[in-house]
C-alpha cells in the first residue's frame, strides 16, 4: 500500500514539513540515510535575520519577514508537541561597520525592521568586547534558534502526530501507474505524494528535468568557540563573518562560502579565515577555546530563492534550495507545502518559487 506522503530529507525543511502535515492528520514517512539534522542543518548557526540577508527589497525579504513573524507561535507549538525546550532568542543583530565607507552604506539601509544606526560609542556600550569599529546598524527583531535542537524537536513532534522515520538512502524517483515509487538502498517505497527536501542532493533524485540542474552545494564551515571575554549578548554581523552568542556562553562563528562540489571536509584555510574575521570584531577571540568546527553543504540556486511547489512529475513536490535561509524559512515553507498538499491552496509566492522557473535555461 502506498504511503500518503513520503518526504526525502530529514533536515530542518523536511522535518518542518513532516510535523506540519502530521499535525493536520496526514500520514507521513520521512527517509534519509543520515540522522535527523545530519546534513547542512547541523552546521547552521540558526540566524533569523531577514533584514540583513536581503537588504534590497524583493521576494527573499518578503518571505523572510513572513516566516519570522510565524516563529514565536511556531516554536511554542513545536516545543509543546515534542515536550522539550528549544533554545530560541531574539536579542537583535548589530551589523558592524569597520570603516567609514561601510558605515555610510549602512546608514542608508532603510529596508525595514526598524533599523537604528548606532555610532562607535553607542555600539561599544552595548557590546564592550568589540574592537575598533565605526558603528553598527541595530535591528531589534532579529534572533536565532538552535537549529539541530529545533530539528530534533520537529522530528519528535512529527512522531507524536504519527509520522515515521526510516534510515535509508533514496536513489531515484519513478512514476508507477497512479503513484510514485522511491527506490532506496533498502527497497522501494510507493507513495501518493513525494516531497523532495534533499537539499544539495536534489539533482540526483529529481526524476524530472525541471530541477535536475539548478541546485548546487555550497560548503559552509562553522566554528564554536569557548568565549573568555566580556559577555557578548547580541548577534554580531561583520563584513567577513557573523558571531552568535549561545545560552551556554559559547560563540558560533560562521560561515565560509565555498563552491567545492560535494567536498564536506573542514579545512585549515576555512578555520583560519573565520578566526581572523572573528578576531577583527572581537580582539579577545584569540584567547577563546577552540571547541569544534562543523561543515554543511548548503543547497543554492541561481537566483538564491528556494524551489517550492509542484514538479513536472505528477505527485512530486519540491521544498529545497533554501541556501543560507533554510532555518529562517522553515515555518513558512512547511505551511506553504502543507496548504498545497492538504487543501490544494497555492500561495501567490509559489509562482515565483516554482521549480520549473529554470527549465528554459537548462
Put a short name on every predicted segment.
Residues 147, 284-362:
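C-terminal catalytic lobe of FAD-dependent flavoproteins
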Residues 46-126, 277-279:
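Dinucleotide-binding Rossmann-like beta1-alpha1 core, especially the glycine-rich loop
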Residues 137-193:
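Helical element adjacent to the flavin cofactor pocket in flavoenzyme catalytic cores
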Residues 84-95, 114-161, 256-260, 320:
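Helix-loop-beta segment of a Rossmann-like dinucleotide-binding subdomain
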Residues 3-29:
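N-terminal Rossmann-like FAD-binding beta1-loop-alpha1 element of flavoenzymes
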Residues 16-24, 33, 46-47, 84-89, ...:
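Active-site substrate-recognition segment that forms the wall
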Amino acid at each position: 500500500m502506498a504511503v500518503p506522503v513520503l518526504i526525502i530529507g530529514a533536515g530542518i525543511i523536511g522535518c518542518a514539513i513532516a510535523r506540519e502535515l502530521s499535525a493536520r492528520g496526514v500520514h507521513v514517512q520521512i527517509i534519509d540515510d543520515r540522522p535527523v539534522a545530519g546534513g547542512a542543518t547541523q552546521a547552521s548557526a540558526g540566524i533569523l535575520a531577514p533584514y540583513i540577508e536581503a537588504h534590497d527589497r524583493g521576494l527573499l525579504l518578503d518571505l523572510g519577514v513572513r516566516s519570522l513573524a510565524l516563529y514565536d507561535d511556531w516554536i511554542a507549538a513545536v516545543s509543546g508537541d515534542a515536550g522539550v525546550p528549544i533554545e530560541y532568542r531574539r536579542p537583535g543583530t548589530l551589523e558592524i561597520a569597520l570603516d567609514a565607507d561601510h558605515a555610510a552604506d549602512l546608514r542608508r539601509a532603510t529596508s525595514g525592521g526598524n533599523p537604528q544606526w548606532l555610532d562607535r560609542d553607542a555600539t561599544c556600550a552595548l557590546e564592550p568586547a568589540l574592537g575598533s569599529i565605526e558603528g553598527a546598524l541595530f535591528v531589534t527583531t532579529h534572533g536565532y534558534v538552535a537549529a539541530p535542537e529545533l530539528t530534533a524537536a520537529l522530528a519528535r513532534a512529527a512522531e507524536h502526530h504519527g509520522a515515521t522515520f526510516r534510515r535509508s538512502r533514496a536513489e531515484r524517483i519513478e512514476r508507477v501507474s497512479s503513484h510514485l515509487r522511491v527506490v532506496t538502498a533498502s527497497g522501494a517505497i510507493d507513495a501518493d505524494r513525494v516531497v523532495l527536501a534533499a537539499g544539495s542532493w536534489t539533482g540526483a533524485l529529481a526524476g524530472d528535468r525541471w530541477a535536475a540542474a539548478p541546485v548546487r552545494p555550497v560548503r559552509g564551515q562553522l566554528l564554536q568557540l569557548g568565549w573568555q571575554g566580556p559577555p557578548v549578548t547580541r548577534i554580531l554581523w561583520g563584513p567577513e563573518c557573523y558571531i552568535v552568542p549561545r545560552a551556554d556562553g559559547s560563540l558560533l562563528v560562521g560561515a565560509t562560502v565555498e563552491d567545492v562540489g560535494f567536498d564536506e571536509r573542514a579545512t585549515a584555510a576555512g578555520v583560519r579565515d573565520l578566526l581572523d574575521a572573528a578576531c577583527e570584531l572581537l580582539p579577545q577571540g584569540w584567547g577563546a577555546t577552540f571547541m569544534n568546527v562543523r561543515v554543511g553543504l548548503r543547497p543554492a540556486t541561481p537566483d538564491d530563492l528556494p524551489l517550492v511547489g509542484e514538479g513536472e512529475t505528477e505527485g512530486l513536490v519540491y521544498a529545497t534550495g533554501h541556501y543560507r535561509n533554510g532555518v529562517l524559512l522553515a515555518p513558512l515553507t512547511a505551511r506553504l507545502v502543507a496548504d498545497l498538499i492538504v487543501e490544494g491552496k497555492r500561495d501567490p509566492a509559489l509562482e515565483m518559487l516554482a521549480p520549473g522557473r529554470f527549465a528554459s535555461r537548462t
